[in-house]
Amino acid sequence: MSAAPTSGPLTCRRAGPLRGAIEVPGDKSISHRSLLFGALSTGETRVTGLLDAEDVHSTRRAVEALGATVRDEGAEVVVTPPATLREPGDVIDCGNSGTSLRLLTGVLSGVPGLSVLTGDASLRRRPVRRVIDPLRVMGADLSARDGDRLPPVVVRGGPLRGARHLLPVASAQVKSALLLAGLFADGETAVVEPEKSRDHTERMLRGMGVPVRVSGLEVSVSAARPAGGRVDVPGDISSAAFFLCGAAALPGSEVTVRNLGVNETRTGLLDVLRAMGADVRLADLREVAGEPRADVTVRADRLEGTEIRGATIPRLIDELPAVMVMATQARGRTVIRDAKELRVKESDRLAAMGETLARAGARIELFEDGCAIDGPTPLRGVEVRTRLDHRIAMAMAVAQLFCGGEPVVLDDVACVATSFPGFFRLLDQVSGPASGGGAP
């Protein structure tokens, strides 16, 4: 079997069913935070299971630019913090990582000195005003391109004051940026969300000794420094989603993902799979370093359409491209609402998935905040413009399994390396191989 290309075009032509037991790479959200919180700490942080992908490499380079030392010791990555974070000597390039840029904006607001945060062409199109505006309420001196809407972001760090923030949209990145700024602020910083977003920041800061107060949808902190410690990163459910959704919809499939993070703020996908009729089983449920994990098995069954909205959306926002593919194979109508956040990801994922699935034969109607998909519908081969978005590329690679043997051609798969460099190899492992063209 020839290796799938790591950049350039790829022609996907696989056969199902999907069968096997796999492990997916470490959770991206937890990996970012492990490095960043380690750099903020008073002591050493040792991380196992850290995601080895471009987005996390961006955070690693950033914390090194701020004075932290990051070294590989066998299966562990060790973060040694500086006595105090220093002003970076150059622009910090966050690559494609919105998490890096937004969380660093919060941290650097309280670090004396001048910092400039930028990224690749995709990241420079992603909005930053919803981070900048609440940080300014805390006294942060920030500016950005296009009327403070878009990166690069210029941060002039200085004294901050605590504030109470009411977020209009649940966002773990915005919440985390404000809480991290709160670690440098005078007085209490509180964040209230309309729905609960992923809570890795709260769990990890608590695990490192920071008093984090949670009351319903409100989270608050005061000035503090984490103590460091040990972090064991579970598998990323957002990466597993492509295999779980494919297995649920493709007859004869059964896939087990071992050591998968099942934090309740991230398991909206499992709820949706069950609601649609998939056979979902969890084994060896345990908690390690404050994060629950399990071996998750999904077996194909006849799927029924469902409605996905409200508090479920923040719990599966990154999994929705895979869910949209699965919905094309479910009987009846699947409706997704309250997902406007999809329009400001690495691409406008609603528009991208809607347009691409429609060309592949799906019956799909787009709304400003979601879509409706009627099924089941046999799909056909299609050429896909990935738009530098890893989740579009991976979702459409799985969609090819429902194309009756016709190929799906991805125009450039380099973006997959931002979160899941081994994706195509693992997909080959549980299905049949792709035929491809591109860089080896």
UniProtKB/Swiss-Prot annotation:
It catalyses: 3-phosphoshikimate + phosphoenolpyruvate = 5-O-(1-carboxyvinyl)-3-phosphoshikimate + phosphate. Pfam families: EPSP_synthase. SUPFAM superfamilies: EPT/RTPC-like. GO terms for biological process: amino acid biosynthetic process; aromatic amino acid family biosynthetic process; chorismate biosynthetic process. Its EC number is 2.5.1.19. Pathway: Metabolic intermediate biosynthesis; chorismate biosynthesis; chorismate from D-erythrose 4-phosphate and phosphoenolpyruvate: step 6/7. InterPro entries: Enolpyruvate_Tfrase_dom, Enolpyruvate_Tfrase_sf, EPSP_synthase, EPSP_synthase_CS, RNA3'P_cycl/enolpyr_Trfase_a/b. Phosphoenolpyruvate binds at K28, G98, R126, Q173, R349, R391. One of its GO terms (cellular component) is cytoplasm. The active site is at D318 (proton acceptor). Keywords: Amino-acid biosynthesis, Aromatic amino acid biosynthesis, Cytoplasm, Transferase. CDD domains: EPSP_synthase. NCBIfam families: aroA (TIGR01356). Catalyzes the transfer of the enolpyruvyl moiety of phosphoenolpyruvate (PEP) to the 5-hydroxyl of shikimate-3-phosphate (S3P) to produce enolpyruvyl shikimate-3-phosphate and inorganic phosphate. Belongs to the EPSP synthase family. Monomer. HAMAP family: EPSP_synth (MF_00210). This is 3-phosphoshikimate 1-carboxyvinyltransferase. It comes from Anaeromyxobacter sp. (strain K).
